[in-house]
Amino acid sequence: EVKYLEQQLDNSLMRLGVEQIDLYYVHRRDPFVPVEEVTQTLASFIKSGKIAGFGFSEISPTTLQAAHAVHPVAAVQSEYSLSTRTPELGVIQTCAEQNITFVAFSPVGRSLLTDKPHNREMAVTIPFLENNPRFLEPNLSYNIAFASKFRDLAFDLGLTAAGLAIAWCLAKGDHILPIPGTRNVDHFKAMVAGSKRILTLEELMAVESVLPIGWAAGDRYSESQWKGPERYT
């Protein structure tokens, strides 16, 4: 509802102590409310000066096109990495065509694309991963073993696996902005190093040869985690 959205926005402005939010996301939209109506409401927030732009998270290409037809969308945030390439089925292309920033979260595959992927013992301590299909056995052992060639390739290229994952992500489009998360300074520096590495066509082909589309075993979300994101094929 318009009143609910505006109240949440006003609450955010108050908590942040600012007069305008640069980018306001609808992370999980109500599928029973037409996206055109939601977009009109968000556009009214721009007109009132409360936000500078808005974006959506985990929406389909069709939904994005419908929203953008009402008012320009500033950004789309979706999971995207060498282990999750679904956005290549239209979202990334639509963003490029419409000059929309594509914000890639989990670009290192929730640790699968790092030098030290989470084992099952670690996964059970992380609520989101505890029942995530890719971190359940036998999928997890398969995924860690399969990605070993990627880790070897990263080493040969003078990067960490996470650094190479970031370099690959950036190479997929000038409009793509990966947002990895880490609490470790060394890991952060390694990913920054990856962001500065421009991969050659041969290197890109090598990366996608060792980790082809669809290599990861298990869905990226459990059934309960799928509540909110739009599925599309």
What does each model-identified segment do?
Residues 1, 71-74, 92-96, 119-124, ...:
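Short, hinge-like loop/turn segments at secondary-structure boundaries
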Residues 1-86, 90:
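Glycine/proline-rich, positively charged
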Residues 12, 21, 34, 54, ...:
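Conserved, mostly hydrophobic/aromatic
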Residues 50, 68-75, 94-103, 174-176:
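Glycine-enriched alpha-helix->loop->beta-strand junction motifs that scaffold or abut catalytic
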Residues 60, 80-84, 106-113, 168, ...:
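Glycine-rich beta-alpha junction loops
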Residues 87-125, 160:
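Aromatic-lined glycan-binding groove of carbohydrate-active enzymes
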Residues 97, 125-152, 156, 171, ...:
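Terminal-tail/helix-coil boundary detector
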